[in-house]
Amino acid sequence: MPNTKSAEKALRVADANRQENRRAKSQVKTSLTKVKKLVDAGSINEAETAAVSAQSNLDKAAEKGIIHPKNAARRKSRLMKKLNQAAK
């Protein structure tokens, strides 16, 4: 339990930030999974449009500091590698 008003506010702020970070991470994971499923199903055109959204989600998460920028770059690279291999 917080003992001061500032500690109460810090608790509220931390909770709000945690919820936002969890939402953003979940959105990233969902968009990546969607692309992978579309690639596995052979829907390359739909996968390409979903990949644009996934890259955007990764960039936004990296920009906000939710994930490390190099983590976002690595995930985008692997995603596009998988998409390009499926397109061949």
From Swiss-Prot:
Skewed-composition ranges (Basic and acidic residues): 1-23
Coiled-coil segments on the chain, per record: none
One Gene Ontology cellular component annotation held by this UniProt entry: cytosol
SUPFAM superfamilies: Ribosomal protein S20
InterPro entries recorded: Ribosomal_bS20, Ribosomal_bS20_sf
Swiss-Prot/TrEMBL keywords: Ribonucleoprotein, Ribosomal protein, RNA-binding, rRNA-binding
Location of region: Disordered: 1-29
Transmembrane spans: none
HAMAP family listed in its UniProt record: Ribosomal_bS20
Function: Binds directly to 16S ribosomal RNA.
UniProt name for this protein: Small ribosomal subunit protein bS20
Biological source species: Dehalococcoides mccartyi (strain ATCC BAA-2100 / JCM 16839 / KCTC 5957 / BAV1)
